A protein has these predicted regions:
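Single conserved hydrophobic/aromatic residue that forms the stacking wall/gate
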Residues: 1-16, 20
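Flexible beta->alpha loop and helix N-cap segments adjacent to enzyme active/binding sites
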Residues: 14-243
Length: 243
């Protein structure tokens, strides 16, 4: 019997993922493998432990990607979240690296604080880019991390701490080891209008209904191409109105 602290969310056993085609890896193999997958501009559903209780996904029920990619913001919006392509995403950054990327010198573990992107990673707009209008101007690359940089050079930051979020911290650390970047895109594990996923079956359903490339449930890695085909039923996309 699995016991949980009072007022906690459920914790699911590994048996919950037994019905899916997946590869089981220990942390020493899983973290670098997922980091490599992310560095190749794949989108990953990340399901770990108990779900968050609050307004933001914090690395337990998250969809994650590479913030250095110029196309990742559009891809994650249009193909996963099913919303406007210009909607910005938030960064998860190692607490020890936060000042390397943002004008911010403290913790923000709940993704509630907004700060400017550091001058050292900003990309100045050219005179031609300044003349652009509307969506064309919104799509201008503004920093070395374009997928998490808002039009005003701000970002809503989540700092990730090894003591309180060890597995997510280990993943970002592995990504940094491979790429030199201690930041990931982090958005909630759901599509537009739906609640955040709770159970493994919720995560799998969202994974199969969207164009996510990989799903990680605890130590199990699932590739979309390995899964049984799902009969397409796009009526679910019409159940929720645009935000």
């Amino acid at each position: 019997m699995i016991r949980r602290p009072p007022r906690s969310t459920p914790l699911y056993s590994s048996a919950a993922s037994d019905v899916y085609k997946r590869q089981e890896l220990d942390d020493t193999l899983l973290m670098p493998k997922v980091a490599e997958i992310l560095s190749q501009e794949n989108v990953v559903g990340w399901f770990q432990g108990r779900m968050e209780f609050g307004p933001r996904a914090l690395g337990a029920r998250s969809i994650i990607g590479d913030p250095r990619s110029k196309k990742m913001q559009s891809v994650m919006n249009l193909k996963i979240k099913y919303r406007e392509s210009f909607r910005p995403f938030a960064p998860s950054v190692l607490i020890e690296d936060v000042q390397n990327y943002f004008e911010f010198d403290r913790g923000s573990p709940y993704m509630l604080m907004v700060a400017p992107v550091s001058d050292q990673i900003r990309t100045p707009m050219t005179s031609d880019e300044e003349e652009l209008f509307g969506i064309d101007k919104l799509n201008v690359v503004r920093s070395k991390l374009p997928s998490i940089t808002h039009v005003d050079y701000s970002a809503r930051i989540q700092t990730v701490h090894s003591q309180t979020n060890p597995r997510y911290h280990a993943l970002i650390s592995s990504f940094k080891e491979q790429t030199g970047c201690g930041v990931l895109i982090n958005t909630s594990f759901n599509v537009r209008g739906e609640p955040i996923v709770c159970a493994p079956e919720d995560a799998y359903r969202c994974f199969m209904r969207t164009e996510m490339d990989y799903l990680v449930i605890e130590n199990f890695l699932l590739h979309k191409s390995d899964q049984a085909k799902v009969v397409s039923d796009e009526s679910w996309m019409n159940e929720f109105e645009l935000d």
